[in-house]
Amino acid sequence: MDKLRMVGGTPLKGEVVIAGAKNAALPILCACLLTDQPVVLRNVPDLQDVRTMLKLLQEIGVTIDFPSAGDRSYMVLNAAVIKSSEATYEMVKTMRASILVLGPLLARMHSAKVSLPGGCAIGARPVDQHIKGLKAMGATIKIKSGYIQAETKPQSDRLKGASILTDMITVTGTENLLMAATLASGTTVLENAAREPEVGDLAELLVKMGAKISGIGSDRLVIEGVDKLHGAEHSVIPDRIEAGTFLCAVVATGGEITVKHCRPDTLDAVIVKLKEAGLQTEIGPDWIKASMQGRPKAVNFRTSEYPAFPTDMQAQLMTVNAIAAGSSMITETIFENRFMHVQELNRLGADIAIEGNTAIAQGVEKLSGAIVMATDLRASASLVIAGLAAQGETQVDRIYHLDRGYDRMEQKLTLLGANIERIK
Protein backbone atom coordinates (compact mmCIF):
# COMPACT_ATOMS: atom_id res chain seq x y z
CA MET A 1 0.00 0.00 0.00
CA ASP A 2 1.47 3.37 -1.03
CA LYS A 3 2.60 5.91 1.55
CA LEU A 4 3.96 9.44 1.36
CA ARG A 5 7.19 10.28 3.15
CA MET A 6 8.23 13.88 3.60
CA VAL A 7 10.74 15.99 5.50
CA GLY A 8 9.25 19.29 6.60
CA GLY A 9 10.62 22.77 7.00
CA THR A 10 11.09 23.85 3.36
CA PRO A 11 9.13 26.91 2.19
CA LEU A 12 7.23 26.30 -1.05
CA LYS A 13 8.24 28.26 -4.14
CA GLY A 14 7.14 28.15 -7.77
CA GLU A 15 4.05 27.54 -9.89
CA VAL A 16 1.37 24.87 -9.61
CA VAL A 17 -1.25 24.09 -12.27
CA ILE A 18 -4.68 23.11 -10.94
CA ALA A 19 -6.54 20.13 -12.43
CA GLY A 20 -10.22 19.91 -13.32
CA ALA A 21 -12.67 19.70 -10.43
CA LYS A 22 -13.41 16.18 -9.22
CA ASN A 23 -16.80 17.25 -7.89
CA ALA A 24 -17.75 18.66 -11.31
CA ALA A 25 -16.23 15.85 -13.39
CA LEU A 26 -18.16 13.04 -11.67
CA PRO A 27 -21.71 14.34 -12.39
CA ILE A 28 -20.60 15.57 -15.82
CA LEU A 29 -19.42 12.05 -16.72
CA CYS A 30 -22.84 10.71 -15.68
CA ALA A 31 -24.59 13.31 -17.86
CA CYS A 32 -23.36 11.46 -20.96
CA LEU A 33 -26.00 8.79 -20.12
CA LEU A 34 -28.72 11.29 -21.05
CA THR A 35 -27.94 11.19 -24.79
CA ASP A 36 -27.17 8.63 -27.49
CA GLN A 37 -24.69 11.05 -29.08
CA PRO A 38 -20.99 11.55 -28.21
CA VAL A 39 -20.02 13.95 -25.42
CA VAL A 40 -16.51 15.43 -25.65
CA LEU A 41 -14.90 16.42 -22.35
CA ARG A 42 -11.68 18.28 -21.60
CA ASN A 43 -9.82 19.08 -18.37
CA VAL A 44 -11.05 15.88 -16.68
CA PRO A 45 -8.76 15.13 -13.69
CA ASP A 46 -6.98 11.76 -13.67
CA LEU A 47 -8.09 10.61 -10.22
CA GLN A 48 -9.06 7.27 -8.71
CA ASP A 49 -12.70 8.39 -8.33
CA VAL A 50 -12.82 9.40 -12.01
CA ARG A 51 -11.34 6.04 -13.07
CA THR A 52 -13.93 4.26 -10.91
CA MET A 53 -16.75 6.27 -12.51
CA LEU A 54 -15.44 5.54 -16.02
CA LYS A 55 -15.33 1.82 -15.19
CA LEU A 56 -18.93 1.98 -13.94
CA LEU A 57 -20.05 3.79 -17.11
CA GLN A 58 -18.31 1.15 -19.24
CA GLU A 59 -20.19 -1.58 -17.37
CA ILE A 60 -23.43 0.25 -18.20
CA GLY A 61 -22.44 0.31 -21.89
CA VAL A 62 -20.67 3.63 -22.45
CA THR A 63 -17.69 3.58 -24.83
CA ILE A 64 -14.81 5.85 -23.83
CA ASP A 65 -12.05 7.03 -26.16
CA PHE A 66 -8.94 9.08 -25.37
CA PRO A 67 -8.08 10.82 -28.68
CA SER A 68 -4.63 12.03 -27.54
CA ALA A 69 -2.22 9.28 -26.50
CA GLY A 70 -1.16 9.70 -22.88
CA ASP A 71 -3.70 12.46 -22.17
CA ARG A 72 -6.51 11.22 -19.94
CA SER A 73 -7.93 14.73 -19.44
CA TYR A 74 -9.47 14.71 -22.94
CA MET A 75 -12.08 12.04 -23.68
CA VAL A 76 -15.08 11.18 -25.82
CA LEU A 77 -17.95 9.29 -24.18
CA ASN A 78 -20.67 7.59 -26.20
CA ALA A 79 -23.75 6.12 -24.50
CA ALA A 80 -25.53 5.14 -27.74
CA VAL A 81 -26.12 1.64 -26.37
CA ILE A 82 -27.11 1.16 -22.73
CA LYS A 83 -26.66 -2.53 -21.99
CA SER A 84 -27.40 -2.37 -18.26
CA SER A 85 -29.31 0.00 -15.98
CA GLU A 86 -27.59 -1.36 -12.89
CA ALA A 87 -24.76 0.03 -10.76
CA THR A 88 -23.55 -2.90 -8.67
CA TYR A 89 -22.41 -2.85 -5.07
CA GLU A 90 -18.88 -3.77 -6.18
CA MET A 91 -18.67 -0.51 -8.14
CA VAL A 92 -20.61 1.77 -5.81
CA LYS A 93 -19.06 0.70 -2.49
CA THR A 94 -15.80 2.54 -3.18
CA MET A 95 -17.36 5.82 -4.28
CA ARG A 96 -20.64 7.30 -3.16
CA ALA A 97 -20.83 9.60 -6.22
CA SER A 98 -21.91 6.49 -8.17
CA ILE A 99 -25.44 7.41 -7.03
CA LEU A 100 -25.27 10.06 -9.78
CA VAL A 101 -26.14 7.48 -12.45
CA LEU A 102 -29.60 7.06 -10.87
CA GLY A 103 -31.25 10.20 -12.28
CA PRO A 104 -29.87 9.91 -15.85
CA LEU A 105 -30.65 6.18 -16.17
CA LEU A 106 -34.18 6.63 -14.84
CA ALA A 107 -34.80 9.61 -17.14
CA ARG A 108 -33.55 7.93 -20.32
CA MET A 109 -34.18 4.21 -19.74
CA HIS A 110 -37.19 4.58 -17.37
CA SER A 111 -35.59 2.19 -14.88
CA ALA A 112 -32.46 2.01 -12.73
CA LYS A 113 -31.02 -0.24 -10.06
CA VAL A 114 -28.27 1.38 -8.01
CA SER A 115 -26.56 0.04 -4.90
CA LEU A 116 -26.72 2.26 -1.83
CA PRO A 117 -23.45 4.23 -1.83
CA GLY A 118 -20.12 3.96 -0.01
CA GLY A 119 -17.10 6.30 -0.25
CA CYS A 120 -15.54 8.35 2.55
CA ALA A 121 -16.41 7.33 6.10
CA ILE A 122 -17.37 10.84 7.17
CA GLY A 123 -21.03 10.60 7.97
CA ALA A 124 -24.31 9.17 6.81
CA ARG A 125 -24.85 11.46 3.79
CA PRO A 126 -28.24 9.87 3.13
CA VAL A 127 -29.83 9.61 -0.31
CA ASP A 128 -33.37 10.19 0.93
CA GLN A 129 -33.60 13.58 -0.79
CA HIS A 130 -32.74 12.00 -4.16
CA ILE A 131 -35.51 9.44 -3.63
CA LYS A 132 -38.03 12.04 -2.44
CA GLY A 133 -37.44 14.17 -5.55
CA LEU A 134 -37.62 11.29 -8.02
CA LYS A 135 -40.84 10.05 -6.41
CA ALA A 136 -42.30 13.55 -6.84
CA MET A 137 -41.46 13.19 -10.55
CA GLY A 138 -43.52 10.02 -10.76
CA ALA A 139 -40.94 7.29 -10.15
CA THR A 140 -41.78 4.14 -8.22
CA ILE A 141 -38.88 3.41 -5.87
CA LYS A 142 -38.13 0.50 -3.55
CA ILE A 143 -35.10 -0.17 -1.37
CA LYS A 144 -34.46 -3.89 -1.63
CA SER A 145 -31.41 -5.97 -0.68
CA GLY A 146 -29.22 -2.86 -0.43
CA TYR A 147 -30.30 -1.49 -3.81
CA ILE A 148 -32.41 1.47 -4.90
CA GLN A 149 -34.80 0.06 -7.52
CA ALA A 150 -36.47 2.84 -9.49
CA GLU A 151 -38.80 2.78 -12.48
CA THR A 152 -41.57 4.68 -14.16
CA LYS A 153 -44.95 2.95 -14.48
CA PRO A 154 -45.83 2.06 -17.13
CA GLN A 155 -42.19 1.68 -18.10
CA SER A 156 -42.66 3.52 -21.38
CA ASP A 157 -43.63 6.67 -19.45
CA ARG A 158 -41.28 9.61 -18.94
CA LEU A 159 -40.69 11.23 -15.60
CA LYS A 160 -43.02 14.16 -15.00
CA GLY A 161 -42.08 17.70 -14.06
CA ALA A 162 -42.67 18.58 -10.41
CA SER A 163 -42.02 21.26 -7.83
CA ILE A 164 -39.45 19.85 -5.39
CA LEU A 165 -38.30 21.42 -2.13
CA THR A 166 -35.49 19.41 -0.54
CA ASP A 167 -35.37 19.26 3.26
CA MET A 168 -31.71 20.24 3.19
CA ILE A 169 -29.21 21.53 0.67
CA THR A 170 -27.71 18.51 -1.08
CA VAL A 171 -25.15 18.79 -3.87
CA THR A 172 -25.48 15.28 -5.34
CA GLY A 173 -29.24 15.41 -4.76
CA THR A 174 -29.50 18.64 -6.76
CA GLU A 175 -27.35 17.14 -9.53
CA ASN A 176 -29.33 13.89 -9.75
CA LEU A 177 -32.68 15.68 -9.87
CA LEU A 178 -31.37 18.28 -12.32
CA MET A 179 -30.23 15.58 -14.76
CA ALA A 180 -33.46 13.61 -14.37
CA ALA A 181 -35.57 16.74 -14.96
CA THR A 182 -33.94 17.54 -18.32
CA LEU A 183 -35.81 14.64 -19.99
CA ALA A 184 -39.02 14.82 -17.93
CA SER A 185 -42.29 15.92 -19.48
CA GLY A 186 -43.24 19.37 -18.23
CA THR A 187 -41.45 21.81 -15.95
CA THR A 188 -39.51 20.95 -12.80
CA VAL A 189 -38.68 23.52 -10.13
CA LEU A 190 -35.88 22.66 -7.68
CA GLU A 191 -36.14 24.82 -4.56
CA ASN A 192 -33.32 24.92 -1.98
CA ALA A 193 -30.94 23.78 -4.73
CA ALA A 194 -27.20 23.63 -4.07
CA ARG A 195 -25.36 26.67 -5.46
CA GLU A 196 -21.90 25.11 -5.68
CA PRO A 197 -19.90 26.05 -8.81
CA GLU A 198 -19.71 22.35 -9.68
CA VAL A 199 -23.53 22.20 -9.91
CA GLY A 200 -23.39 25.23 -12.18
CA ASP A 201 -20.76 23.56 -14.36
CA LEU A 202 -22.98 20.49 -14.78
CA ALA A 203 -25.91 22.75 -15.68
CA GLU A 204 -23.78 24.57 -18.29
CA LEU A 205 -22.98 21.23 -19.98
CA LEU A 206 -26.65 20.18 -19.91
CA VAL A 207 -27.61 23.46 -21.61
CA LYS A 208 -25.00 22.77 -24.32
CA MET A 209 -26.69 19.36 -24.76
CA GLY A 210 -30.05 21.05 -25.38
CA ALA A 211 -31.52 21.23 -21.86
CA LYS A 212 -33.62 24.24 -20.90
CA ILE A 213 -32.47 25.42 -17.46
CA SER A 214 -32.86 28.81 -15.83
CA GLY A 215 -31.59 30.05 -12.47
CA ILE A 216 -28.11 28.51 -12.81
CA GLY A 217 -26.02 29.53 -9.80
CA SER A 218 -29.08 30.26 -7.66
CA ASP A 219 -30.99 28.15 -5.13
CA ARG A 220 -33.99 27.90 -7.49
CA LEU A 221 -33.50 25.93 -10.69
CA VAL A 222 -36.28 25.77 -13.29
CA ILE A 223 -35.96 22.97 -15.85
CA GLU A 224 -38.26 22.68 -18.84
CA GLY A 225 -38.08 19.06 -19.96
CA VAL A 226 -37.19 18.23 -23.57
CA ASP A 227 -37.75 15.05 -25.61
CA LYS A 228 -34.09 14.44 -26.39
CA LEU A 229 -30.63 15.74 -25.59
CA HIS A 230 -27.73 15.79 -28.06
CA GLY A 231 -23.94 15.59 -27.86
CA ALA A 232 -21.78 18.52 -26.79
CA GLU A 233 -18.23 19.62 -25.94
CA HIS A 234 -17.29 20.91 -22.51
CA SER A 235 -14.24 21.72 -20.39
CA VAL A 236 -14.52 20.90 -16.67
CA ILE A 237 -13.99 23.87 -14.32
CA PRO A 238 -10.76 23.99 -12.26
CA ASP A 239 -10.80 22.35 -8.83
CA ARG A 240 -11.29 25.04 -6.16
CA ILE A 241 -10.51 22.54 -3.37
CA GLU A 242 -7.16 21.59 -4.91
CA ALA A 243 -6.35 25.29 -5.32
CA GLY A 244 -7.36 25.98 -1.71
CA THR A 245 -5.25 23.05 -0.50
CA PHE A 246 -2.10 24.48 -2.11
CA LEU A 247 -2.88 27.91 -0.66
CA CYS A 248 -3.16 26.35 2.82
CA ALA A 249 0.15 24.56 2.22
CA VAL A 250 2.00 27.81 1.55
CA VAL A 251 0.43 29.44 4.63
CA ALA A 252 1.69 26.50 6.72
CA THR A 253 5.21 26.30 5.24
CA GLY A 254 5.86 29.87 4.18
CA GLY A 255 7.15 30.82 0.74
CA GLU A 256 5.63 32.14 -2.46
CA ILE A 257 3.64 30.24 -5.08
CA THR A 258 1.49 31.04 -8.08
CA VAL A 259 -1.63 28.90 -8.40
CA LYS A 260 -2.42 28.74 -12.13
CA HIS A 261 -5.48 27.64 -14.09
CA CYS A 262 -7.83 28.23 -11.17
CA ARG A 263 -11.08 30.12 -10.60
CA PRO A 264 -10.40 32.69 -7.85
CA ASP A 265 -14.06 33.79 -7.94
CA THR A 266 -15.06 30.38 -6.49
CA LEU A 267 -12.60 30.70 -3.58
CA ASP A 268 -13.74 33.92 -1.91
CA ALA A 269 -14.58 32.38 1.49
CA VAL A 270 -11.26 30.49 1.62
CA ILE A 271 -9.13 33.46 0.54
CA VAL A 272 -10.76 35.73 3.15
CA LYS A 273 -9.80 33.32 5.95
CA LEU A 274 -6.27 32.75 4.65
CA LYS A 275 -5.73 36.51 4.46
CA GLU A 276 -6.84 36.71 8.10
CA ALA A 277 -4.14 34.11 8.81
CA GLY A 278 -1.54 36.36 7.14
CA LEU A 279 -1.44 35.29 3.49
CA GLN A 280 -0.56 38.01 0.97
CA THR A 281 -2.31 37.61 -2.38
CA GLU A 282 -2.35 39.08 -5.86
CA ILE A 283 -5.29 37.78 -7.90
CA GLY A 284 -5.82 37.59 -11.66
CA PRO A 285 -8.67 36.13 -13.74
CA ASP A 286 -7.30 32.56 -13.56
CA TRP A 287 -4.35 32.75 -11.17
CA ILE A 288 -3.48 33.58 -7.57
CA LYS A 289 -0.02 34.69 -6.47
CA ALA A 290 0.29 33.85 -2.78
CA SER A 291 3.12 34.61 -0.36
CA MET A 292 3.51 33.97 3.35
CA GLN A 293 6.09 35.09 5.87
CA GLY A 294 6.21 34.27 9.56
CA ARG A 295 3.81 32.31 11.67
CA PRO A 296 0.12 32.28 10.70
CA LYS A 297 -2.51 33.85 12.96
CA ALA A 298 -5.30 31.62 14.30
CA VAL A 299 -8.67 32.09 12.58
CA ASN A 300 -12.14 30.99 13.65
CA PHE A 301 -14.32 29.53 10.91
CA ARG A 302 -17.50 27.60 10.33
CA THR A 303 -18.29 25.35 7.39
CA SER A 304 -21.50 25.78 5.46
CA GLU A 305 -22.92 25.47 1.95
CA TYR A 306 -21.50 27.54 -0.91
CA PRO A 307 -20.75 30.44 -1.01
CA ALA A 308 -19.70 30.01 2.65
CA PHE A 309 -16.53 28.21 3.78
CA PRO A 310 -16.47 24.69 2.24
CA THR A 311 -16.42 21.58 4.41
CA ASP A 312 -13.88 20.11 1.96
CA MET A 313 -11.35 22.74 3.14
CA GLN A 314 -11.97 22.31 6.87
CA ALA A 315 -9.16 19.82 7.56
CA GLN A 316 -6.56 21.81 5.60
CA LEU A 317 -7.28 25.10 7.39
CA MET A 318 -7.36 23.25 10.72
CA THR A 319 -3.74 22.22 10.05
CA VAL A 320 -2.84 25.89 9.57
CA ASN A 321 -4.57 26.68 12.89
CA ALA A 322 -2.62 23.87 14.58
CA ILE A 323 0.64 25.85 14.13
CA ALA A 324 -0.88 29.35 14.30
CA ALA A 325 -0.36 31.97 16.98
CA GLY A 326 -3.42 31.92 19.24
CA SER A 327 -6.43 29.67 19.66
CA SER A 328 -9.26 29.02 17.23
CA MET A 329 -12.69 27.45 17.01
CA ILE A 330 -13.63 25.36 13.98
CA THR A 331 -17.31 24.42 13.62
CA GLU A 332 -18.38 21.71 11.16
CA THR A 333 -22.04 22.03 10.14
CA ILE A 334 -22.19 19.84 7.00
CA PHE A 335 -20.99 16.37 8.03
CA GLU A 336 -20.89 14.60 11.35
CA ASN A 337 -17.73 12.61 12.10
CA ARG A 338 -15.49 14.90 10.03
CA PHE A 339 -12.84 15.43 12.70
CA MET A 340 -11.03 12.11 12.28
CA HIS A 341 -7.85 13.96 11.29
CA VAL A 342 -7.67 15.63 14.73
CA GLN A 343 -6.28 12.53 16.43
CA GLU A 344 -3.58 12.22 13.75
CA LEU A 345 -2.68 15.94 13.92
CA ASN A 346 -2.33 15.56 17.69
CA ARG A 347 0.13 12.69 17.07
CA LEU A 348 2.29 15.28 15.30
CA GLY A 349 2.14 17.52 18.38
CA ALA A 350 -0.97 19.60 17.70
CA ASP A 351 -3.20 20.61 20.62
CA ILE A 352 -6.76 20.20 19.35
CA ALA A 353 -9.80 19.19 21.39
CA ILE A 354 -13.25 18.26 20.08
CA GLU A 355 -16.52 19.35 21.67
CA GLY A 356 -19.50 18.14 19.65
CA ASN A 357 -19.27 19.62 16.15
CA THR A 358 -16.59 22.12 17.18
CA ALA A 359 -12.83 21.69 17.36
CA ILE A 360 -10.77 24.01 19.57
CA ALA A 361 -7.16 24.39 18.43
CA GLN A 362 -4.46 25.88 20.64
CA GLY A 363 -1.70 26.77 18.21
CA VAL A 364 1.73 25.24 18.85
CA GLU A 365 5.00 26.66 17.55
CA LYS A 366 6.13 23.48 15.84
CA LEU A 367 4.82 20.07 14.84
CA SER A 368 7.15 17.06 14.98
CA GLY A 369 7.29 14.40 12.29
CA ALA A 370 5.67 11.02 12.96
CA ILE A 371 3.86 8.17 11.21
CA VAL A 372 0.19 9.09 10.72
CA MET A 373 -2.75 7.50 8.96
CA ALA A 374 -5.13 9.11 6.46
CA THR A 375 -8.79 8.45 7.26
CA ASP A 376 -10.51 10.18 4.34
CA LEU A 377 -9.75 12.28 1.27
CA ARG A 378 -9.42 15.78 2.74
CA ALA A 379 -7.93 14.49 6.02
CA SER A 380 -5.10 12.99 3.96
CA ALA A 381 -4.41 16.40 2.39
CA SER A 382 -4.34 18.03 5.83
CA LEU A 383 -1.77 15.49 7.05
CA VAL A 384 0.44 16.13 4.02
CA ILE A 385 0.34 19.87 4.79
CA ALA A 386 1.16 19.11 8.44
CA GLY A 387 4.11 16.94 7.38
CA LEU A 388 5.45 19.71 5.14
CA ALA A 389 5.33 22.14 8.08
CA ALA A 390 6.64 19.72 10.74
CA GLN A 391 10.22 19.28 11.93
CA GLY A 392 11.73 16.00 10.82
CA GLU A 393 10.26 13.13 8.82
CA THR A 394 6.54 12.38 8.52
CA GLN A 395 4.98 9.36 6.86
CA VAL A 396 1.33 9.40 5.80
CA ASP A 397 -0.15 5.91 5.40
CA ARG A 398 -3.29 4.91 3.45
CA ILE A 399 -2.59 7.48 0.79
CA TYR A 400 -5.15 5.87 -1.52
CA HIS A 401 -7.58 8.32 0.08
CA LEU A 402 -5.50 11.19 -1.37
CA ASP A 403 -5.44 9.60 -4.83
CA ARG A 404 -9.25 9.64 -4.90
CA GLY A 405 -9.27 13.43 -5.14
CA TYR A 406 -5.83 14.86 -5.98
CA ASP A 407 -4.05 14.56 -9.32
CA ARG A 408 -0.30 13.84 -8.75
CA MET A 409 -0.16 15.86 -5.54
CA GLU A 410 3.32 14.77 -4.47
CA GLN A 411 4.72 15.53 -7.95
CA LYS A 412 3.24 19.02 -7.86
CA LEU A 413 4.65 19.60 -4.37
CA THR A 414 8.08 18.37 -5.49
CA LEU A 415 8.04 21.00 -8.25
CA LEU A 416 7.40 23.59 -5.51
CA GLY A 417 10.52 22.43 -3.66
CA ALA A 418 8.95 20.11 -1.10
CA ASN A 419 10.97 17.12 0.10
CA ILE A 420 8.30 14.47 -0.50
CA GLU A 421 8.19 11.03 -2.13
CA ARG A 422 5.80 8.15 -2.64
CA ILE A 423 6.98 4.86 -1.16
CA LYS A 424 5.57 1.34 -1.04
Curated annotation (Swiss-Prot):
E.C. numbers: 2.5.1.7
Residue numbers carrying 2-(S-cysteinyl)pyruvic acid O-phosphothioketal: C120
Catalytic activity: phosphoenolpyruvate + UDP-N-acetyl-alpha-D-glucosamine = UDP-N-acetyl-3-O-(1-carboxyvinyl)-alpha-D-glucosamine + phosphate
Gene field: murA
A molecular function (GO) term: UDP-N-acetylglucosamine 1-carboxyvinyltransferase activity
Domain of life from the UniProt record: Bacteria
Name of the protein in question: UDP-N-acetylglucosamine 1-carboxyvinyltransferase
Phylogenetic classification of the source organism: Bacteria, Pseudomonadati, Pseudomonadota, Betaproteobacteria, Burkholderiales
Class of enzymatic activity (EC top level): transferase
Keyword field: Cell cycle, Cell division, Cell shape, Cell wall biogenesis/degradation, Cytoplasm, Peptidoglycan synthesis, Pyruvate, Transferase
